Every structure is written in C-alpha cells, then in structure tokens.
Amino acid sequence: MDYAKESLRLHKEWKGKIEVVATVPVENKDDLSLAYTPGVAQPCLEIQKDVEKSYELTRRHNLCLVVTDGSAVLGLGDIGPEAGMPVMEGKCALFKEFGDVDAFPLCIRSKDVDEIVNTVALLAGSFGGINLEDISAPRCFEIERKLKERCDIPVFHDDQHGTAVVTAAALLNALKFTGRKIEDIKVVMSGAGAAGSAIIKLLIELGLKNVIMCDRKGAIYEGREGLNEEKAKMAAITNREKQAGSLADVLKGADVFIGVSAPGTVTEEMVKTMAKDPILFPMANPVPEIMPDLAMKAGAAVVGTGRSDFPNQINNVLAFPGIFRGALDVRAKDINDPMNAAAAHAIANLIDESELRADYIIPDPFDPRVKEAVSAAVAKVARETGAARI
C-alpha cells in the first residue's frame, strides 16, 4: 500500500480524526435546564468553593491537552503549528483508543518558550494533564521544566519520556533474553537530543551505571568544549571515565547500542567490535542507524527499531495512553521518574521470560493487557511517591 497517498485521500474524507460528542441528552426543556442554565449554576458554585470539585463535576478528570509548536514534527522538522495538526489529532485518537483518555490538540503559533509556557499554564485549569509533542530541543526541556513548576497537573513530553519508557521495557527484556544484568552492561547512545537524554536518565533510574552518549562530534564527556547546557548536564551523569573519540571508538566492547540519531551511522564492522551477542536498538525513522538484517548478520542477538515492518517495534503507543490513564485515575500532580520506571517494568513483564525470543521482546501495541498493566502500575507508584491526590 502507498501509505502517503492513501492517508492523504482518507484525511480529505475524514476532515479530522476527533470530534466533541455530548455525553448527556439535551432533548427537552428539562434536559436543557439541567445541562445548562439554570441548573448548571449549582455545580459552578460548588467548584467556586473547592476547585478540586472540577474533577468530579466536569470532564476535567479525563481530559488532556496535546501541545505542539510544530517545530519538530516527526522526521519532517519545523513545519509549523497548522501543519502539525494532523499529527496532534492522530495523537488524540491514540489517547482515546488505547487509554480511553479524552485529548484535545493545541497547536501554538509561537516558538518563544515563555509565550508557550504562559499559554499552556493559563489553560491548565481545564485539563487533567498536558502532553507536549514535537517541540524541538533544547527548548522542549525548558518548556517542560517551567510548566512543571507552574502547573499542578502532570506535564509529560512524550518524545522524551514515552520513548524512554518503551526503550527501557525493550531493553529489560533483551537483557533477560541474553542473560545480562543492567548494572553490568555498557551502553552507547547515539543522539543527544530530547529522546536520548530521557532514555539515559530512565535507564540510570533502573540501575544502569556505564553509559556513553554521542553527538555528531563523538563522545560527550565532562570538560568537552562547546557543550550546551543540556549536554553538559548529561556529561555530568554519563561517561565517568571521560572516554573521548568517535561513535565507532566508544562502541568497541559495548553490550548495547541505542540510536535516536541519523540513518546509516552504524556499520556491520562497528557491530562486530561490540561485546558478544550485542543488543541494538537503531530507532532513527524512517531509516534506522543500521538495518536489522545487517545488524543480525554482524552478530547482534536482538534488534529493535521504531518501525512497524520490522520485529520488536519500540512504539510510544505502548506507554503514553496507559501512563496518562494511571495518572488521571489518581488525579496525579505530576508524572515522576518512579512512575515512568513502573510503566517500563509493567510493559516488560507482560512477556513471560519463557516466551522471550530474539524477535519478541516487546508486546504488540494492540495487546489488550497493556493499558491495564501500565495504568495500574503508574497509579500505584503515584500513590507511593505522593504524586496522587486520591
């Protein structure tokens, strides 16, 4: 199938992938008086007395905002907020279908950090959570940080944390399959943007000790000249031996390669220099850092990508619907690192160790167990860490 051509045809037919639907009947005068004036005044007064009642008396308890500025849409780059709308609508559809979360797209005509933060923060009282999407680095880090400071509802940048959760889940199972422990392995990350940073932080939360991050100039380490603020922060928690050199240099002896960078950055020869039975997650889209067949030919034990036409697709839809479902169910004030770690374990544990195979380390996104497992794990840890309101 020509997905581009067929998708364009269907988008013209659909004229949007989401809609607002009334949940109550408005078929007579009594219905009208209850859903709207004069009866609606009473819930308004209740919320005036206690804003928390907005979760009980409105749809806020199940409503999320999906926010973009259109600056980093898929692999298309800075295409603008209006052009990002089809992706945001699609995201909202996935929220509903995979998490039963009502989501609304907000495409903002600004790239100014403070304008975006102020716009979203002013709207936060109408929503139970905020999902940031397709905002370019390093601004995405600052936007998320400032919104977390200003908002008392979860703020979640899916390009960072959703990717990190599913990558971590896949790695946990790949380590089981190859007989390794996370505290003993060496990981090399290609890509120092939003996703790469979040993946490393979550893996460290899960026990990883030895990890080297690379950008276009090679290994990142403390003291390397020209690092921006975010890369300097990553240098402080990675590459403790301050190993310098190219990606090829630091990949020697590594157990795991994770790529969120560019096509063709890893060769068969580089894979052959890694530890025995290496794990490779080349996730650049649509063309990965190395094609799976080449990685396997060079000795890889497990390969996962971001593509649905290869085994072991590392797909964010396994994470964000269940994470938000769990957070909303307990009226969470935040989605913290332990909650993300719990989501990763929940996804990984859906596959019994006896069922693991080289081509089956991560559940299918359509597995009906995913939402319940992830949401329950996230809600439990939200309560344990004090992030839950109820």
What are these regions (language model features)?
Residues K12, Y55-R60, L65, K96-E97, ...:
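Solvent-exposed alpha-helices and their adjacent loops that cap or buttress functional pockets
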Residues R150-A164, L280-N285:
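Short, acidic/small-residue loops that bind anionic groups at enzyme active sites
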Residues A232-A301, R307-D309:
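Rossmann-like adenosine-cofactor binding region
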Residues P105, N131-D134, V155-D158, M189, ...:
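General beta-strand structural signal in soluble alpha/beta enzymes
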Residues L74, I79-G99, H157, H161, ...:
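Glycine-rich phosphate/diphosphate-binding loop of Rossmann-like nucleotide-binding domains
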Residues D158-D159, R180, P282-I390:
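Adenosine-phosphate binding glycine-rich loop
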Residues M1-V155, S375, V381, T385-R389:
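N-terminal ligand-binding/catalytic initiation module
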